[in-house]
Design a protein with these regions (language model features):
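Membrane-integral, polyisoprenol-dependent glycosyltransferases
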Residues: 2-243, 247, 251-353
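Phosphate- and divalent-cation-binding pockets in alpha/beta enzyme and binding domains
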Residues: 65, 221, 444-445, 485-486
Length: 521
């Protein structure tokens, strides 16, 4: 028992290291969605309560409250904002262990868990502060609970399953596929006239009732806010009304290739989701994945295999049906079952090698494949410092976030570039900063990361027509078009120094301009 616990603890520790490394400083910026999430969470701490769907694209609420709890303890830093998502990603590793062990035993459980701990997709998913990872965690736990309930026939486990599936409707929009997935699995069991289905009939009814009861407020809210709920899916859809048959077939073929090749050839190209173009699995896991897929077709695994394959196929639909395929966030629903495939392949490889050679060779080959896969992830993600690369910095809106860093470093408080916990005051008495509304108002990054709003925080002021600049040292953050006007207001006898701010390229207008200038004296 102690040995088994130690193995699992070691895998969880590996997952934690890969996900928590440099959390306070890498990347040294906030992406727009992260900043908006942070502002919403800060609003909760101020007494505001978001609805069931927030923002124009309809964001579910659970993660806002988790982020609020984190920043209440650690302060408003990127690391504090991302910590709940990192913990959810680590929790996903444990949930995969529970599910894999329940379905296929302890050995597959360890293998699947190690793969989840060391594969780039779930590692990076936790470092990007958006809500998709919570769906993967909750549904992995729900599938484990369902498997335990099916085996034990215990009503209590069916209730837990219903609660978890219900909670999934408050996590991420791919939850719209949860009910179809349940129906598909039950329909398959009914077609096979499973005795276990009849024995679990009452429990399944309880699960569905609990799921529906918990999800009902979200369903009603979505029904009353159809434009908010479905405008983005309609915008992203690759199939549309009036599409010609030739175009439909071409799109169908293209999407199929794009989605299927993500596993071994070319994955998500977005640096917010992935090392651009990197497939889900490296070369070391390609053959084990295919062997595991074949193993699930064997008679001894067939029922479980059909459930796993049906779940995976259904939750590939969100990326298959939308633009920018493959999209790792939209495909997040497959993560609970994804690592079962290579884990089974590795198990069968080990058994075959043990029978044809000996245990030492089997251990060396399977262990070597696992070690190579984990090393490749650590090398590409950590050793090559992916999160601090220039294109990742740009993808995370590093230029816009720099305003917050410039302000906080001058005030000597808050997040100053590498700290997980916000630096406390007091503010330097001699420091006064004025920020141009043309710079501040469109910058949610600074609005979240700077410890307080303009004119309400010591030393931080709005640069408006009535502003009185102090005769002592001061700093202005001015929109480039307003610099000349404000240079005339510098206190007499002071020499103004103008430092150009970062460049920002607007892909829509193709224009490049300075975000702000720093005027100091």
């Amino acid at each position: 028992m102690l040995r088994r616990t130690s193995i699992l603890a070691s895998i969880i520790a590996l997952a934690a290291v890969l996900r928590l490394w440099g959390i306070g400083s890498a990347p040294p910026a906030l992406q727009y969605d992260e900043a908006v999430n942070g502002l919403t969470a800060a609003g909760i701490l101020a007494g505001e309560h978001p609805g069931l769907l927030m923002q124009k694209d309809g964001r579910e609420p659970i993660h806002f409250y988790l982020v609020a709890a984190s920043i209440a303890v650690l302060g408003k830093t990127p690391g504090a904002l991302r910590l709940p998502y990192v913990l959810a990603s680590i929790g996903l590793v444990a949930a995969v262990w529970l599910l894999a062990r329940e379905l296929f035993g302890r050995k597959v459980g360890w293998l699947a868990t190690l793969l989840c701990a060391g594969t780039l997709w779930p590692v990076y998913l936790g470092r990007y502060g958006t809500r998709s990872v919570f769906f993967a965690l909750v549904t992995a736990l729900a599938l484990f609970s369902a498997a335990r309930a099916w085996r034990s026939r215990a009503i209590g486990w069916w209730v837990v399953t219903g609660l978890l599936f219900g909670v999934s409707y408050y996590t991420y929009p791919v939850n719209l596929f949860v009910l179809p997935a349940i129906v598909l699995v039950l329909a398959g069991a009914a077609l096979r006239r499973s005795e276990a289905l009849r024995e679990n009939g009452r429990g399944i009814a309880v699960m569905i009732a609990v799921t529906a009861l918990l999800a009902l407020p979200m369903w009603l809210y979505r029904g009353a806010s159809l434009t908010q709920s479905f405008s983005r899916p309609q915008h992203l859809a690759v199939f549309y009304a009036g599409q010609g048959p030739v175009d439909f077939v071409k799109t169908l073929a293209a999407q199929t290739v794009l989605v299927l090749r993500m596993f071994f050839l070319r994955g998500d190209a977005n640096p917010l989701h992935n090392i651009p173009g990197r497939p889900v699995f490296d070369a070391a896991m390609a053959l084990p994945f295919l062997l595991g897929l074949a193993a699930l077709a064997q008679m001894r695994y067939r029922r479980r295999g059909l459930v796993i394959a049906a779940w995976a196929a259904l939750f590939l639909l969100p990326t298959f049906l939308s633009k920018s395929a493959p999209h790792f966030l939209r495909a997040v629903g497959i993560l609970p079952v994804l690592f079962l495939f290579p884990a089974l392949g590795l198990l069968h490889t080990h058994r075959w090698l043990r029978q044809t050679t000996n245990r030492a060779v089997a251990n060396m080959v399977v262990g070597g494949l696992m070690a190579v896969s984990v090393f490749v992830t650590a090398r590409d993600f950590l050793l090559r410092d992916f999160l601090n690369s220039p294109y990742v910095y740009r993808a995370y809106n590093g230029e816009e976030t720099s305003l917050a860093l410039q302000i906080n470093r001058r005030l000597g408080i808050g997040w100053t570039g590498s700290n997980l916990v916000t630096r406390p005051g007091p503010v330097r008495d001699s420091m006064h900063i004025w920020v141009d509304p043309d710079v501040w108002d469109g910058n949610p990054y600074a609005q979240f990361l700077v410890p307080g709003p303009l004119d309400e925080f010591p030393g931080l002021h709005t640069l408006s027509s009535g502003a009185e600049l102090t005769a002592s040292a001061g700093v202005l953050f001015v929109h480039p078009q307003n610099v000349a006007a404000w240079l005339e207001h510098i206190p007499a006898g002071k020499t103004a120094r103008v430092q150009p701010g970062p460049w920002l390229h607007d892909p829509d207008t193709k224009a490049t301009q300075r975000l702000y200038h720093i005027v100091s004296w």
